[in-house]
Amino acid sequence: MIEANQLHDLVVKPALLSLGKQFSQRAARTLIMGTIAHESMSGRFIKQVGGPALGIIQMEPVTHDDIWENYLRYKPELVNRLKLLFEINDPNVDRLIYDLRYNAVMCRLHYRRVKEKLPAADDIQGMARYWKTHYNTANGKGSTEQFIQHFNHYIAGAL
């Protein structure tokens, strides 16, 4: 498990700030921290048994590739920034296995595609619903109750 203050201060916040202030508001950082808390037990897993998802955000390869192919392809300035930040020419889903900041950025970009406004940073129930609707989806195994439980266990008090 990655200690929550360190995860936030050394990974999530600087990763999002490197994209620009419009990506790094407190609500976005809280949602990403909650996503990590639930999806990987705050960094305990980078790949779980029985599924394709990778990294501390447990993103499936098809989702990773879709962000690059159907979102970022229309945002060349952002693509250039990502290529400079991560010193990459071609995105590779395997980067989720070893690059914590890449995890934070990809998670933020996944949520950034959503038209619905982020819940307030202190609205954990709203964050749980947002995560379930836009990240885990109706077909996912996770529940809002589990999200809240994991948030309270791993993250609460650190942000």
Regions inferred by a protein language model and the residue ranges of each:
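Peptidoglycan-targeting cell-wall enzymes and recognition modules
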Residues: 2-17, 23, 34-115
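Secretory-pathway/luminal and periplasmic proteins that interact with or process carbohydrate-rich
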Residues: 39-47, 136-145
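Inter-helical turn/loop segments and adjacent helix faces that build the functional surface
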Residues: 114-122
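Long, charge-rich low-complexity segments
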Residues: 144-159
